[in-house]
Amino acid sequence: APPRANPPPSAALSPRTVFYSVTGSKQLLDIVNVVYTDARGFPVTEFNVALPWTKMVVLNPGVQTESVVATSIYSRLNCGVLNAQGQLVVASANNSIIATCTR
């Protein structure tokens, strides 16, 4: 199943808000790293994250890329990108060691 996130009420959100999510089963002693596109359009890496992982980002004007990539050695990962209205705009539900969601 595609990952789901529960964004706060959209009335207070910028239309440029995106929600990144990574779900799955993290194996004992495995490390899950996540790379996502930040507000300026640059990649940011978070190391050894807990699952489920979510991040809210308000993209600067002109930033078009919405991306989250999760990697591991053994874990089974899925990812998703939701827009400000909470709609899933891209998802990967492959339960694999790498999950890529880019729009």
What are the residue ranges of the model-derived segments?
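A short, amphipathic beta-strand motif
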Residues: 16-24
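Mature extracytoplasmic domains of secretory-pathway proteins
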Residues: 23-72
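Extracytosolic low-complexity repeat regions of secreted or lipid-anchored proteins
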Residues: 54-103
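Residues at beta-strand starts and edge strands
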Residues: 14-16, 51, 75
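N-terminal low-complexity, Pro/Thr-rich disordered segments
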Residues: 1-17
